[in-house]
């Protein structure tokens, strides 16, 4: 599907979807908790639906009610082996690998798109050192797990994916004894591990932080909080806020200003670029602004690179985004894809090993290829609002992965 966007005003209001990061964690913990959990905002993104489908195969029941979802936890061990289709969701795969191992489930994980190329070796190695047999097969790609995870020390690199750490945090309390997560280097995107800690607290569990990682008690049972309110997604709000700075104003609703989501840092980052952003009871409003160039290290908030890149393409003076080498292993090589997309629209963008450099010359328009990456497609749409000529976004349906309502909101009558 192709969508052509003419330069002009952004929608005046946008409601962001349920936080994908919070949603994965909440669904998995609710599936393992004592008692049912009610989520007032039902998931809609492809990634969260993938997690729900896998949990359903593992024995979880979901009852959809009007504007809510009731989660009934896993009732008993399902027949083995399970086939768990993670679709294109890295979070689903990396969270459920250790959870299935902790439950002693024999499971075959499958996926599609770029998921088979995304790294998981260090996580599998940690599981294999603690009682699990794992076999990775190609053509078709799948990972088969067998055995039951045993308590102990789990060593992980910190510079590959914080999702490894979060997956173990979710799983290790289920083991018969205490365990420890030990990081062999500094943890990138540490805020996402902090988000997992916060969600664990909401299900009644406190972890102990150590200089090298965490100590995790064993033999625990998660306690459902009953009703679990989740916030809106700050990584998606970032696109609307960038759109407001370029072609606003845009008022974003559905966000928790005190959220633990790392992507909440989009507010000070845009203000660092001289953006005018105001908070009110109605929401967060970004106004048209004369953006100025700046340098941003996105190692702690890598999902913000695409919306920041769209804004930096129009900023006065040079801008740089650094700390983003891991984005080469996302749904696309997000660095190369973002640079190529903006160049195709007439931008002066230099790709660096771990980031991008922008001359801030503005964009002409043309055809934007997001390489099947939902975040690149949304960045192209935001940039199109301030281009001199129309922009045609190819493969526009890829936004279904995280934000199915995106185009409906974006193309509303202004």
Show the residue positions of the predicted features.
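Short, structured segments at the rim of ligand-binding sites
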Residues: 1-414
């Amino acid at each position: 599907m192709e969508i052509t966007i003419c330069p002009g005003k952004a929608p005046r209001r946008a409601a962001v979807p349920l936080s994908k990061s919070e949603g994965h964690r909440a669904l998995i913990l609710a599936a393992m908790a004592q008692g049912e959990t009610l989520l007032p905002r039902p998931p809609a993104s492809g990634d969260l639906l993938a997690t729900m489908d896998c949990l359903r195969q593992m024995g979880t029941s979901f009852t959809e009610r009007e504007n809510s979802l009731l989660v009934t936890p896993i009732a008993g061990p399902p027949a083995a082996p399970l086939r768990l289709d993670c679709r294109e969701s890295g979070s689903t795969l990396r969270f459920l690998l250790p959870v299935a191992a902790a439950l002693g489930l024999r499971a075959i994980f499958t996926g599609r798109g770029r998921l088979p190329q995304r790294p998981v070796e260090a996580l599998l190695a940690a599981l294999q050192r603690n009682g699990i047999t794992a076999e990775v097969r190609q053509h078709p790609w799948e990972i088969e797990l067998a055995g039951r995870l045993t308590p102990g020390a789990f060593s992980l690199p910190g510079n590959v994916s914080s999702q490894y750490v979060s997956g173990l945090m979710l799983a290790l309390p289920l083991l018969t004894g205490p365990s420890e997560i030990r990081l062999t280097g500094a943890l990138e995107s540490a805020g996402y591990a902090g988000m997992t800690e916060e969600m664990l607290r909401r299900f009644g569990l406190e972890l102990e932080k150590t200089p090298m990682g965490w100590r995790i008690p064993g033999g625990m049972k998660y306690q459902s909080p009953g009703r679990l309110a989740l916030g809106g997604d700050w990584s998606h709000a970032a696109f609307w806020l960038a759109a407001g700075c370029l072609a606003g104003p845009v008022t974003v609703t559905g966000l928790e200003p005190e959220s633990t989501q790392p992507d909440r840092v989009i507010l000070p980052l845009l203000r660092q670029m001289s953006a005018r952003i105001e908070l009110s009871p109605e929401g967060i409003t970004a106004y048209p602004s004369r953006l100025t160039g700046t340098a941003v290290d996105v190692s702690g908030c890598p999902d913000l690179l695409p919306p920041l890149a769209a804004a930096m393409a129009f900023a006065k003076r040079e801008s740089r985004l650094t700390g983003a080498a891991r984005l080469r292993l996302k749904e696309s090589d997000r660095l190369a894809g973002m640079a190529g997309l903006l160049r195709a629209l007439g931008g002066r963008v230099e790709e660096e090993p771990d980031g991008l450099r922008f001359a801030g010359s503005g964009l002409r328009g043309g055809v934007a290829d997001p390489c099947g990456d939902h975040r690149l497609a949304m960045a192209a749409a935001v940039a199109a609002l301030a281009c001199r000529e129309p922009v045609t976004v190819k493969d526009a349906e890829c936004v279904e992965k995280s934000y199915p309502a995106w185009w409906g909101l974006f193309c509303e009558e202004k």
